[in-house]
A protein has these predicted regions:
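Conserved C-terminal "switch" segment of AAA+ ATPases
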Residues: 147-203
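Walker A/P-loop NTP-binding motif of AAA+ ATPase domains
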Residues: 1-172
Length: 204
């Protein structure tokens, strides 16, 4: 679904435009820290081999206007805004408002509907986001939760992060003990487990 929304629309740009549909799209990835939002963004970017990709995070968020101008000129393009809640808090939480919020809204609105531009936003805190960003059509078209992994997902992650280390065939206990744990935490747990085994004279 994510790849289709980000890449599929661009692949069918000519047909969609001819039929009167807009190309500009906004995608919001949300979920607790460490669940894999950034990894998902990287996966999408890796597939967009023909797109201009602009990533804004931290202090770089202040560059939203020139970044969007560049994205309009170099389509197809993807503008990634990481931790968008840093600049797009609801005005009830920040009565004075954040000038960058208005810059973001103006930048998104300034992109023509038929421009092959994707705004890819991430956040850990959907509750504080400005309604004008997430509820107005034409800004965020699709919001997708990146949740903590379920049991099957945790087992896959344990095996993935073990890399070449030898694991017991039955990971039932480890899967149960990691209930509610994020993907990044599982990666760190596996690193510590392998280190402990090596310190104890074991092999991998």
């Amino acid at each position: 679904q994510l790849s289709h929304h980000v890449l599929g629309i661009g692949d069918r740009a000519a047909q969609l435009t001819e039929l009167g549909f807009h190309l500009k799209r906004g995608l919001l990835l949300y979920g607790p820290p460490g669940t894999g939002k950034t990894h998902t963004v990287r996966h999408l970017i890796a597939q967009a081999v023909e797109a201009t990709v602009i990533v804004l995070s931290g202090e770089g968020l202040a560059m939203i206007e020139p970044a969007t101008t560049l994205a309009r000129r170099l389509t197809p393009s993807i503008v990634v805004v990481e931790d968008v809640d840093l600049i797009a808090q609801d005005r009830d939480y920040s009565p004075t408002g954040n000038p960058l919020l208005f810059s973001l809204l103006d930048a998104m609105d300034g992109v023509a509907a038929d421009a092959d531009v994707t705004f890819l936003l991430t956040t850990n805190r959907t509750a504080v986001l400005e309604d004008a960003l997430v509820q107005r059509p034409g800004r965020v078209d699709l919001a997708v939760e990146i949740p903590r992994p379920d049991a099957a997902g945790r087992e896959r992650l344990l095996r993935l992060y073990a890399r070449d280390a030898t694991l017991e065939a039955d990971l039932t206990d480890a899967v149960a003990r990691t209930d509610g744990v994020t993907a990044s935490a599982i990666k760190e747990l596996m690193r510590r487990a392998v280190l402990a085994a090596l310190d104890g004279g074991g092999t991998t």
